[in-house]
Amino acid sequence: MIKQRTLKQATTVTGIGLHSGQKVKLTLRPAPANTGIIYARTDLTPAVYFTADANLVGDTTLCTCMINDDGVRISTVEHLNAAVSALGLDNLIIEVNAPEVPIMDGSSSPFIYLLLDAGIEEQESPKKFIRIKQTVRIEDGDKWAELKPYNNGLKLDFTIEFNHPMISKDVRHFNMELSAKNFIHNISRARTFTFMKDVEYLQSMGLALGGSLDNAIVLDEYRILNEEGLRYKDELVKHKMLDSIGDLFMCGYNILGEFTAYKSGHGLNNKLLRAVLANKNAWEFVTFDDTQQAPQGYQIGEQVFI
């Protein structure tokens, strides 16, 4: 049987909030089987809790942000979500003492090591997957994203398009099958990126106050401003794929399907996920009593993550 997973113990880290520029304390706690992924604002009294839910995503400007009916927000959840999804965690309490998850270095890598350091353990309940049964496609001008049936895991294919000398055709496309090993080695270190002109505008509006060359790739009109350069030659498209993994995990379950996207972002990813979940004929819950029948990325061998 493919079993649910949680952490062995709680773990805490402090980082900077991308938007506020203030310190944020993040605590990740184990949770009982069938709890799901729960987010908590512990700076509020009483604490405010959110369950992973595509319909709670209320703002996708610069990041994925959940907003409840009272207007309480938790922003920048996507990089942590991607790490949680890649490691196949099902039950987790995510606590922050601010309106946002810390940006760390702009990638998922710090969250991966935080989770692995806490340890991952299986629980005595079957893991539920969402299996895609029908193709669903969302378009916005020339941008599009779709999910279609694929039973052996989550296959991802992403293409970006930017008119910039550092973003040539050979680094605009990437595809991968999601597994812990593939995620850690191929895309977990891919950082968020932005353009200098956008940074200046956002900070003049009181946004992205925590953004810096320490947690983002910044490009001017001609070059990359980070002295150390890129971590992968195709780091930009890999980060967009990382974002998509996090955005698709807003349903709280690992998806079995094939995701293909062209110039997609947080907003379009969320619209796609909502459209899939709203169509009861397009998906179903599945479990695997026979481990050998499960997607390879979730079989026992994948316990060796690094």
Curated annotation (Swiss-Prot):
UniProt binding sites for Zn(2+): 79, 239, 243
Xref: Gene3D superfamilies: lpxc deacetylase, domain 1, lpxc deacetylase, domain 2
Pfam families: LpxC (PF03331)
Domain of life: Bacteria
UniProt keyword Cell membrane present: no
Protein function: Catalyzes the hydrolysis of UDP-3-O-myristoyl-N-acetylglucosamine to form UDP-3-O-myristoylglucosamine and acetate, the committed step in lipid A biosynthesis.
Name listed for the protein in its UniProt record: UDP-3-O-acyl-N-acetylglucosamine deacetylase
Gene transcribed to yield this protein: lpxC
